[in-house]
């Protein structure tokens, strides 16, 4: 399977830096990496999607066409920008913003019906990891049980919560075992990405694992040259 790289700007990128980053990436991305790169700015960092060489996505959207949902963006906002790719289930939205499994299912089903490409994030906390691999498998299976795993526009990103933003990636053995288990659950055509303190130093080794189909990258993607270095490992 062709490997891919995704940049998640979270809420860290200044608005105009985000705009400049997108334009520069479009100009400088090498042809062998066209269609293998995704970028998820925050909402103010988005631009009308006229980009031909990479996929522009949104970090979040409310599962309605439009309406009285103060502070939210909806499918019509994204469609007006010609954006049809969405992150769902990121741990920061699960934990900080209390998005429940039932709400994540509602989001998934709504945007599946709109034929959006969905990047669905899963991952366990440290307390679960410390209980052993059986507990991890049960936890991740539960996170996936409410969504359509045969949806053709699905990408799954495994991000162990204890590794996100800690500068402590999961070990190569942990990634190998966990991705191997998840590959048994997922449709064989569904890409499975790893995220969690990915950086220039470890990205190439992680991509070398057969069951890792790409990377979802946080802070290491916030400087364009760093992200392009990681892209070069694809």
From Swiss-Prot:
Which reactions does this protein catalyse? D-glyceraldehyde 3-phosphate = dihydroxyacetone phosphate
Could you tell me which Gene3D superfamilies the record lists for this protein?
Answer: Aldolase class I (3.20.20.70)
In the record, biological process GO terms are: gluconeogenesis; glyceraldehyde-3-phosphate biosynthetic process; glycerol catabolic process; glycolytic process
Annotated localization: Cytoplasm
List the EC numbers from the record.
Answer: 5.3.1.1
Q: Which InterPro entries match?
A: Aldolase_TIM, TIM_sf, TrioseP_Isoase_bac/euk, Triosephosphate_isomerase, Triosephosphate_isomerase_AS
Q: In which pathway does it act?
A: Carbohydrate biosynthesis; gluconeogenesis; Carbohydrate degradation; glycolysis; D-glyceraldehyde 3-phosphate from glycerone phosphate: step 1/1
Judging by the UniProt lineage, the source's domain of life is: Bacteria
Q: What are the protein's GO molecular function terms?
A: triose-phosphate isomerase activity
A cellular component annotation (GO) from this entry: cytosol
* Keyword Isomerase listed: yes
Q: Name one Pfam family in it.
A: TIM
Keywords assigned: Cytoplasm, Gluconeogenesis, Glycolysis, Isomerase
Similarity comment text for this entry? Belongs to the triosephosphate isomerase family.
Quaternary structure, per UniProt, is: Homodimer.
Biological function: Involved in the gluconeogenesis. Catalyzes stereospecifically the conversion of dihydroxyacetone phosphate (DHAP) to D-glyceraldehyde-3-phosphate (G3P).
UniProt protein name: Triosephosphate isomerase
Give the species this sequence originates from.
Helicobacter pylori (strain HPAG1)
């Amino acid at each position: 399977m062709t490997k891919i790289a995704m940049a998640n700007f979270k809420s860290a990128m200044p608005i105009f830096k985000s705009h400049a980053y997108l334009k520069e990436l479009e100009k400088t991305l090498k042809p062998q990496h066209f269609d293998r790169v995704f970028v998820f700015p925050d909402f103010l960092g988005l631009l009308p999607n006229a980009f031909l060489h990479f996929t522009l996505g949104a970090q979040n959207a409310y599962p309605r066409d439009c309406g009285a949902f103060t502070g939210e963006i909806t499918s019509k906002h994204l469609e007006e920008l010609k954006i049809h790719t969405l992150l769902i289930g990121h741990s920061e939205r699960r934990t900080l913003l209390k998005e429940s499994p039932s709400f994540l299912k509602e989001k998934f089903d709504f945007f599946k019906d709109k034929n959006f490409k969905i990047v669905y994030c899963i991952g366990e906390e440290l307390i679960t990891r410390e209980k052993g691999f059986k507990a991890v498998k049960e936890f991740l299976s539960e996170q996936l049980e409410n969504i359509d795993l045969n949806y053709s526009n699905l990408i799954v990103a495994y991000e162990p919560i204890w590794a996100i933003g800690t500068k402590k990636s999961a070990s190569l053995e942990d990634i190998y075992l966990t991705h191997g288990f998840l590959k048994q659950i997922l449709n064989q055509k569904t890409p499975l990405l790893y995220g969690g303190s990915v950086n220039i130093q470890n990205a190439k080794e992680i991509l070398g694992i057969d069951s890792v189909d790409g990377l979802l990258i946080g802070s290491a993607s916030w400087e364009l040259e760093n992200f392009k270095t990681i892209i070069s490992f694809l």
